[in-house]
Curated annotation (Swiss-Prot):
Entry GO MF terms: ion channel inhibitor activity; toxin activity
Pfam families: Conotoxin
Keyword Disulfide bond on entry: yes
Source organism superkingdom: Eukaryota
Protein name according to UniProt: Conotoxin mr3f
One cellular-component annotation, GO: extracellular region
Keyword annotations from UniProtKB, A to Z: Amidation, Disulfide bond, Neurotoxin, Secreted, Signal, Toxin
Biological source species: Conus marmoreus (Marble cone)
InterPro entries reported for this sequence: Conotoxin
Post-translational modification Aspartic acid 1-amide, affected residues: 70
Tissues of expression: Expressed by the venom duct.
């Protein structure tokens, strides 16, 4: 009886969990492929924004990805 319980647990719990984990990886790969099409400046801005770091904007070009620095 114990062997049948172990087999049922593996088939009904562990096998579906393994297949769901593989399905969850696909959207992340698709998102990464889309981000590779960005130019290097956009990619740098996204990475710095995600890290919470901001750089000085070029002269007269202030926007949300950088700080307006004096100088």
């Amino acid at each position: 009886m114990l062997k049948m319980g172990v087999v049922l647990f593996i088939v009904l719990v562990l096998f579906p969990l393994a297949t769901l984990q593989l399905d969850a990886d696909k959207p992340v790969e698709r998102y990464a492929e889309n981000k590779q099409l960005l130019n290097p400046d956009e990619r740098r801005g996204i990475i710095l924004h995600a890290l919470g770091q901001r750089v000085c904007c070029p002269f007269g070009g202030c926007h949300e990805l950088c700080l307006c620095c004096d100088g």
